[in-house]
Each structure stands twice: as structure tokens, then as C-alpha cells.
Design a protein with these regions (language model features):
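Short, structured loop/turn "capping" segments at alpha-beta junctions
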Residues: 121-125, 152, 158-164, 231-235
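Short beta-strand/turn micro-motifs composed of small residues
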Residues: 45, 71, 141
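A structural signal for isolated positions on well-ordered beta-strands in alpha/beta enzyme cores
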Residues: 68-69, 138
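Glycine-rich phosphate-binding P-loop
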Residues: 137-156, 186
Length: 303
């Protein structure tokens, strides 16, 4: 639930962010057609925003199926952040496997967990007098959370188009992962309406929705507000001095106001072009050049 989130540094005041292009709507229709054919759902989320990248319809889709929750981009947050989330999910009765598809960290554990789930499914088939068969798994998640990069790691060669951009995978395709597991790489799916605008902002910051959906300057300002709210949170990984050293503008006094900070930094770096400066700030965050920053942290773990 969104109540698990904390440390947001005030209200987020950006115009409503909505993004549901035709190819996403089509992807959801394709996905629903294939759900009956799969035994295992491998859900992939983003470690920086593990709640915002959870699809609200997921429980409806995974009903009666094995569900493996993979949190990708582990290397982009602090160990304290992912350990806190691991405990939080455990308290909800949900085991998680953490990995980083780009560096390969934890990918073997994902593979082992998927094969284990497959073995359990085939054991159940045997007990019912049915013959074992390769398990059919579906990777599911928001656009740009790294599903295709993870599949490429799992099969150890590039078989699926993969790029850091929302909506690169447009069609469904099967990939053989060992002799006992077939994987279906599905395009990213989003809810038709982004009702939780705080989550929508996080998706925009992590480049999980198309740039046409939001105003870059306003999202950059909201990002700065978010950092100010998170800086005192243990595990968030916000170090304002990195920002100040990189851009030469202190986050204090008058320039502690995000609009003034963006204006002053644009004067220094982009000839006063605030839109270009906003894009640079967002790109730097997305490439981890501002440190390992978790935009979402669990409120507390109830033991």
C-alpha cells in the first residue's frame, strides 16, 4: 500500500501525469490472451521505486499462478534501502529476489528461483498423474524496468531488444531458458489511469513512462523537492554535496527553492535554458551520477 512510503518532502505539485499510448493498451490485450497459457509469472520492479512499479491489477492477473517477484536495479540504491525493502516485503508474506540485470548481480539467484518454481509445478503435475513439461513463464512489469535486459542475462546472449527507454519491447516473444523453462517476454504494461500522482512522478523520474506525458522542468523541480525531503532518511542515499559539487549551485538559502536552483544552474550550464538543464538533471539521476538514491523507502518493518 502507498502508506508504506515515507519521506517525500511536501506535496508534489506537478500537472497531472497521464500516459497510456496505443501500444501499451495493445500490450495489455495481448498479455491477457497469454495469461491462461503460463504457469509462472516473473514480475520485475525497479529497486528505486518498488511500490510505484507494482501494477494495481497484478493480483487479478496472478490468481492461482506461481508468482516470483524480482526487484531489478539493485545496484542503483544503497544496500540499506534494499535490505529494508526485503524485510518489508517479507513481513507482507512476499519473498523477493534482488538483482541488477545490467551488471549481472543476483541474476543467478533469479534463474535458480524460477527453476525451483518450475520444479514445484512439475512435481504437482506428477502427483496428479500428468507428465512433466517445460514450464511456461511470463515476465511482467512496467515499461523500462529492465525485463528484456534480465532475459538477455538469463539466456546469456542478446535475444531481446533492450534499451533504457520506456516501450522498447512492442511484441510478445518466447525464449527457451534451459530445457525446462520457456520465458515469454511481454511489453511493459501500465494502468490506463495513473491515479496515484506521486507514483506517476516516480515513474517519470525513473524514465518508466514516455517524456511526452510530463513537463520536464516541473518534474525536475519536484525531484529536487523529493531529495530535500529524503536527505535525512537513513538508506535513501541522498547526498546534497554531490549535487552541489556537480553543478556548482548550493542547495541552501535562496537556491534551496527548486525553481530558483534550476534557474541559477541553467544560467551556469545551459545558457539559461531551464528545459535543457532539467533534462540534464534527470539524465544524471537516471545514470546514477548523483549517487545511489532510493526514491521510496518503507515506513517501518512490522515484525
Amino acid at each position: 500500500s502507498a502508506r508504506a512510503l515515507s519521506g517525500f518532502g511536501g506535496a508534489v505539485s506537478t500537472p497531472a501525469i497521464q500516459w497510456y499510448p496505443g501500444h501499451i493498451a495493445k500490450a495489455e490485450q495481448q498479455l491477457k490472451r497469454h495469461l491462461d497459457k503460463v504457469d509462472l509469472i516473473i514480475e520485475v520492479r525497479d529497486a528505486r521505486i518498488p511500490l510505484s512499479t507494482g501494477h494495481p491489477h497484478l493480483n487479478r492477473w496472478i490468481h492461482g499462478k506461481h508468482h516470483l517477484l524480482v526487484i531489478n536495479r539493485r545496484d542503483m540504491v544503497t544496500p540499506a534501502a534494499w535490505e529494508a525493502w526485503e524485510q518489508w516485503f517479507k513481513a507482507q508474506g512476499q519473498r523477493t529476489v534482488w538483482c541488477d540485470a545490467k551488471s549481472g548481480t543476483g541474476v543467478k539467484q533469479v534463474q535458480q528461483a524460477a527453476i525451483r518454481a518450475g520444479n514445484q509445478l512439475n512435481e504437482r503435475r506428477r502427483n496428479r498423474g500428468m507428465r512433466p513439461r517445460p514450464v511456461r513463464a511470463l515476465t511482467l512489469g512496467f515499461p523500462n524496468v529492465g525485463k528484456s535486459a534480465l532475459i538477455n542475462r538469463l539466456v546469456k546472449k542478446k535475444v531481446v531488444a533492450s534499451a533504457r527507454r520506456a516501450g522498447v519491447t512492442r511484441t510478445l516473444r518466447w525464449v527457451r531458458l534451459g530445457q525446462d523453462l520457456d520465458l515469454l517476454d511481454a511489453p511493459g504494461v501500465l494502468p490506463p489511469r495513473l491515479d496515484d500522482q506521486r507514483a506517476a512522478l516516480h515513474l517519470a523520474l525513473c524514465d518508466d513512462i514516455g517524456q511526452a506525458a510530463y513537463d520536464g522542468e516541473l518534474v525536475a523541480q519536484a525531484f529536487l523537492r523529493l531529495l530535500l525531503g529524503l536527505k535525512s532518511r537513513e538508506g535513501a542515499g541522498v547526498v546534497l554535496s554531490i549535487l552541489e559539487e556537480r553543478y556548482g549551485t548550493p542547495v541552501a538559502g535562496r537556491t534551496a527553492d527548486p525553481a530558483f536552483w534550476l534557474e541559477a544552474t541553467a544560467e551556469r550550464h545551459t545558457s539559461g535554458d531551464k528545459a535543457r538543464m532539467a533534462q540534464r538533471l534527470l539524465d544524471d539521476f537516471r545514470r546514477s551520477l548523483l549517487g545511489s538514491i532510493a526514491l521510496e523507502l518503507p515506513e517501518k518493518v512490522v515484525s
